[in-house]
Amino acid sequence: MARYKNPKSPAKLKQQIVLPTCKLDSNLVLLPGIIYNVTFSRFKAAALLYRYKDLVSQVSIINNLLNEYEFNPSKDSDSVEEDDMVTSPITISKVAVEGIEQFFKYEAAFKNSQGLVSEKDIAEVAPSNEFDWLTLAIKPNLEKIKEPSNAQIDPTEHNSVVTIARIVGIVDDTTNIKLTLQAITRGLKIAPKKKTRPNEQLLEVDWSSDIPELRRHFKSLKDSSLDLFKVIDKFIVDYRQALSINSANGNKSNLQITKPGSRYKGANGSSQKPGDLLTLNPLANALYLQLAGSKDFSKAFLSLQKLYGQFASDENLKVDTKSYLRLLDLTCGILPFPNHEKLKLLHKISIDDRGNELINMINQLIKIFDTLDGNNSFVNHWFYNEATNIQKANVVANQLKSIRLLLEGMTNKTRPISNRGNIKSFNNSENGNNNKTNGSGITSRRPKSNEDGGEVYDEEDDDEEDDELRAITNFIKYKLPNITTLSPDSKRLIIKDFKRIRASSQSPGGGGNSDFHVIRNYLEIVMDIPWDKYVTKFKSNKDIDLNFAKKQLDDDHYGLEHVKKRLIQYLVVLKLLGINAEKQISDFRKENQVPSPSSSGSNLATQNSLVPASSIVIANNDETSFAHKQAQNKVKTSIKESNIENQTNQSIQVTKYNKSPIIMLAGPPGTGKTSLAKSIASSLGRNFQRISLGGVKDESEIRGHRRTYVGAMPGLIIQALRKSRSMNPVILLDEIDKVIGGSSGVNKFNGDPSAALLEVLDPEQNTSFIDHYLGFPVDLSQVIFICTANEPHNLTRPLLDRLEMIEVSAYDYNEKLIIGRKYLLPRQVKRNGFPASDRIEEFVNIDDASMKKIIVDYTREAGVRNLERKLGTICRFKAVEYCEGLSGKSFYNPNVEEADLPKYLGIPYSSGDFSSIETTISNNSRVGIVNGLSYNSDGSGSVLVFETIGFDKRVGNPNSSNTGCSLVMTGRLGEVLMESGKIGLTFIKSLIYKNLIQAKEQPDDKYLIEKFNNLELNLHVPMGSISKDGPSAGITMATSFLSVILDKPVPADVAMTGEITLRGLVLPIGGVKEKMMGAHLNGNIRRMIVPRENRKDLIEEFSRSVEEAGDVVDSNLMNELLKDNEEADFKMDKVEKFYLKRYGIQIFYAREFYDVMKILWGEDDLLTKPKSNRILEYHL
């Protein structure tokens, strides 16, 4: 809606648009080119922003503010008066939306030009930012702007121009709303041909700026402004000098009186000037406070001086019309001109008139400073040279008397009784009937009734209370009654504390007592908790996008399909509950004929006649009485509807019945547990908070301290809710196994924090979690708690029982290769300063051989933390080479080959792993040398060699008696591991004494018994500085003992793990996958012996590996594998072939120790007695 007024002249471009309007409550005059911070009441800011709600729906701070109020706009918007639009706002019209779009186009063209805009410069540009839509016309409040004679501004002369501004910032200080307004240009009101809404105005915007004799105009403005700057600088210097003189003289007395015309000597003998009365001049004080009393003004004034200084220092600097127009408004807006003068300049549409008016204002201000200087010189001369001491004393006394009267007038100033009565009665009509109202009858979400047993505080505001107390009052009056998650008893306790703080503030001494500050801090914290606020990416649960959530999880993490599957199941349940709840609400409304929320608002205005006149008694005029009746009518109607809504809310609460999962991610460090929790929050669109529990040893850190203690604060859970600003965040309880307490046996003087977590992490109890500081239950059922632990079995049994544990196992070589190439390397390339690009190979290219060597030789871990650290090191080296290539010193090669790794990463680490294949000087003997498998504390697996050497006591000592076999074990072995060795030796002894085995070429039955009784065994496990423990090396040590006794070597390519019993049974162990990866990385292991009962673990890991590879596992195949596994001799070997192909290791299973002997030495007839088919009486 734009047109040219003068199509013959391209520079004369004018635009006619319709824009929303807003009248300020203060006397502020907005001049174009300046950014203003304007404070609005929360209600008026909400009413203003409500008009744009369809255009700024994604701005969270606006949505949060609008959620505090429920506006009921009238359908017949054209018939509503403008004042009613403030209390019953409606969204802006389509014409106003088009006006904002057209204004944005012309504004963009004006910014890109040198001040001359033509039709060809107008491009099709749409607002890109949601704040671009917050464009409005600001109308000055003429009632608040006074002339020097204390008369109001004539509205007929100064009501035709508005300031077109844009809201560029919003700050919520819990009491008021501060809007940052960027004043853009002027708009001239014109009479519309078609009727517009009362809060919208047809405006004419003049974008033309053709100024004849621009340089002459600018020279006049520059000269006048520079003269004013000199006068201002001189005044500030004189005033500060007067302050310093009076301050120095004030060391002896309040006012130094010297003899006329004399100069006096100071204490140090220096000559000083007499005092200066400039600081006693009210005009001087007012000017100084405006010029130097504000940092914001000082900063703006210096910027204005710099702008003029640029043109003053360079006469040849080109002055364009845009700079000239900007200087006009900036000069008037920054300098201390009164508001009525600024209003006159705002209404100067003609640029020539605007320039002349500003120069006249500047010259008038210069005269004021000159007059002030002359008057001050006269007074100083008379006071210090001609006045007698009595006259001086009278002057000082009159000054003090005037100050005292002024202070008394300020402190005793009260509102007229008639006005106070009107306001009080109107507030009572809004708030005195158990209903939250704002403005003129704007009702809240539900009435403030006490039908639910709660107590409602309903006392009028006190204008003289501080802002913090006023914010608490607004919370108690307006928000607390509508909080659905608080019980009536909890609300009653909060209101009781609020009444105590109000009584303390009104008692003698004010808020000086300790209880006042303690309760106020408590109420501020209660107010800061985000009650009934739920943040999510989706508008409702039925709109949950499962594909998006799955894609988000896949993009952030590779594999971990079992974790992702559990989260997708949770989202599916939420989606179904949302669909069911909506259907239940719809059916309920049809059965009970409940009107929809959109139609209920129109019924309120038709029932005014139903309210009896005697129900409200007000001793005020008819207009206030009518408003009172209207509010009372809305109260009764809303109470009637609330009875029906209480039943519909039961259907709405169906969604909340689904308890959020409480998950524990257990696994070694560096496997992505913490980052997975962040990804979960991102996929759900919820806020994320991390609580580190490592080293927490006080129960009060979880539950909070009681208010009786000094410095008491809520616990970590409530603090996380406050930081997240929602009641349904994703809270990560990191390192929950590091909590000090539980089974650790520490002193329980400060309580057990792990016991405090029992209530938090129990879905059946956390709906009413009580923090000691708050003292009332808080609903945590919608919070998703995700715990992480490295050693989950360190947790107490009750706490572990409450958690849904999901194991995040160690990554194998193939997974690390994919993770490093797809996730870690691109992230390190970006973090180390390389240009953004989709092809990272152009900057750092690591081939598979080099990546494998980094994984195997430079990192030995279960996770990928050290792998990312090594990739970061390589990227930093390549960044140096890339910069040298940019400077032309050398050619940049992005490739990283295996031979380059020592240059970047140094010498590969010594793995410490070796196997029995290593040769020794003892004829390369492998007797007694057996490869075991260990699960390390960092979550990785490795090969652990067990060495046993036997000595016959009879050699060199023929008289040695059969004292029995002795055993010495070294290598920093733990108690459980040493017991396993003793059990293994006892089992071997039982085989020998029962004659179940025989030595090769020694048919004598007593040979092995005599050898065993005269044998001295020494078992050692290398890497003696590392502690080792656990029962899984039972069959390994037993095999080592038997190898020495039979003098039979053990194959070097075999590794084994399993717990042994005294009967020779092989029991299952843990960490099979990690041990298999350790054997694979060793490089020398080709066969692996595991307990037969661990095959089901390998089947589960097989299924998980197939899913993470992107393939679909056939459910029939899994059923067949599990059914086949129940047989003693399984027939399906698909699992074993999978691991053979993936790791190059053939898996064997052992139910009893005889299976181990058979795998190692085969069907050796000399090994067992011919008559004995099995070595045990007990068979599985």
Curated annotation (Swiss-Prot):
Acidic residues: bias regions: 452-465
PROSITE patterns linked to this entry: LON_N, LON_PROTEOLYTIC, LON_SER
Keywords: ATP-binding, Hydrolase, Nucleotide-binding, Peroxisome, Protease, Serine protease
Single GO term (MF): ATP hydrolysis activity
E.C. number(s) listed in UniProt: 3.4.21.53
Gene Ontology cellular-component annotations: peroxisomal matrix
Keyword S-adenosyl-L-methionine assigned: no
Matching SMART domains: AAA
Organism superkingdom: Eukaryota
Low complexity bias (residue ranges): 422-444
Domain (Lon N-terminal) ranges: 19-366
Stretches for region Disordered: 416-465
Role this protein plays: ATP-dependent serine protease that mediates the selective degradation of misfolded and unassembled polypeptides in the peroxisomal matrix. Necessary for type 2 peroxisome targeting signal (PTS2)-containing protein processing and facilitates peroxisome matrix protein import.
Family to which this protein belongs: Belongs to the peptidase S16 family.
Protein name (record): Lon protease homolog 2, peroxisomal
Lineage of source species: Eukaryota, Fungi, Dikarya, Ascomycota, Saccharomycotina
